[in-house]
């Protein structure tokens, strides 16, 4: 006998082997592309930018949200041969704003790692032997 149990936000459904073997009678409903409550990707069906898309990571709503929207919109709607080449001022304004809030908009880790000076490696007896072997085999 199958049954359903609710545990907090979870709904647990137990089915018998017989229940599991019968074909499903569930009907799939096609998504309505014009449903305003339906989640969409970055670009809405009408071509507009979906500022509520989680893919933007909240960039459109932070302290530099207006600068981000301006730069992103300019790039999205750009018709230049080099797409976005007409948006330099908007991207510069966004970058300047983001630099005012380093805790909210941290620099990429790669850039931070490149900025760190490389520490010299101490030569040990093992590295000297390896180097000598390499020189011996290469000549």
Curated annotation (Swiss-Prot):
Q: From the record, which residues define motif Cx9C motif 1?
A: 64-74
Reported modifications of this chain: Forms intrachain disulfide bridges, but exists in different redox states.
All copies of domain CHCH, residue ranges:
61-105
Find motif (Cx9C motif 2) and give its ranges. 87-97
What does the record say about the knockout?
A: Mutants have a developmental arrest coupled with embryonic lethality at 8.5 dpc. They show a major defect in the expression of respiratory chain complex I subunit NDUFS7/CI-20.
Q: Where in the cell is it found?
A: Mitochondrion intermembrane space
Which InterPro entries does the UniProt record give?
CHCH (IPR010625), CHCHD4 (IPR039289)
Taken from the UniProt record, the cysteine pairs bridged by disulfide bonds within this chain are 53-55, 64-97, 74-87
Report a single Gene Ontology molecular function.
protein-disulfide reductase activity
On tissue specificity, the annotation reads: Widely expressed. Present at high level in liver and kidney, followed by lung, brain, heart and spleen (at protein level).
Query: What's in the keyword line of the UniProt record?
Result: Disulfide bond, Mitochondrion, Oxidoreductase, Protein transport, Redox-active center, Translocation, Transport
* A GO term from the CC aspect: mitochondrion
Q: Key word Transport present in the record? A: yes
Sequence ranges of Acidic residues compositional bias: 106-124
- A GO BP annotation: mitochondrial respiratory chain complex assembly
Q: Where is this region: Disordered?
A: 102-139
Comment, domains: The CHCH domain contains a conserved twin Cys-X(9)-Cys motif which is required for import and stability of MIA40 in mitochondria.
Q: What does this protein do?
A: Central component of a redox-sensitive mitochondrial intermembrane space import machinery which is required for the biogenesis of respiratory chain complexes. Functions as chaperone and catalyzes the formation of disulfide bonds in substrate proteins, such as COX17, COX19, MICU1 and COA7. Required for the import and folding of small cysteine-containing proteins (small Tim) in the mitochondrial intermembrane space (IMS). Required for the import of COA7 in the IMS. Precursor proteins to be imported into the IMS are translocated in their reduced form into the mitochondria.
Q: How does it assemble?
A: Monomer. Can form homooligomers. Interacts with GFER and forms transient disulfide bonds with GFER. Interacts with MICU1. Interacts with COX19 forming transient intermolecular disulfide bridges. Interacts with COA7 through transient intermolecular disulfide bonds. Interacts with AIFM1; the interaction increases in presence of NADH. Interacts with NDUFB10.
Q: What is this protein called?
A: Mitochondrial intermembrane space import and assembly protein 40
| Natural source organism | Mus musculus
Q: What's the gene? A: Chchd4
């Amino acid at each position: 006998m199958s049954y359903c149990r609710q545990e907090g936000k979870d709904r647990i459904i137990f089915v018998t082997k017989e229940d599991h073997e019968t074909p499903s009678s569930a009907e799939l409903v096609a998504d309505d592309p014009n449903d305003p409550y339906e989640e969409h990707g970055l670009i809405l069906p009408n071509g507009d930018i979906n500022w509520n898309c989680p893919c933007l990571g909240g960039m459109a709503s932070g302290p530099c949200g207006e600068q981000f929207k301006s730069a992103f919109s300019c790039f999205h709607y750009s018709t230049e041969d080099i797409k976005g080449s007409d948006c330099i001022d908007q991207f510069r304004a966004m970058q300047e704003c983001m630099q005012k809030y380093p805790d909210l908009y941290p620099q990429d880790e790669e850039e931070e790692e490149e900025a760190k000076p490389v520490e010299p490696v101490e030569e040990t007896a093992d590295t000297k032997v390896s180097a000598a072997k390499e020189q011996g085999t290469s000549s």
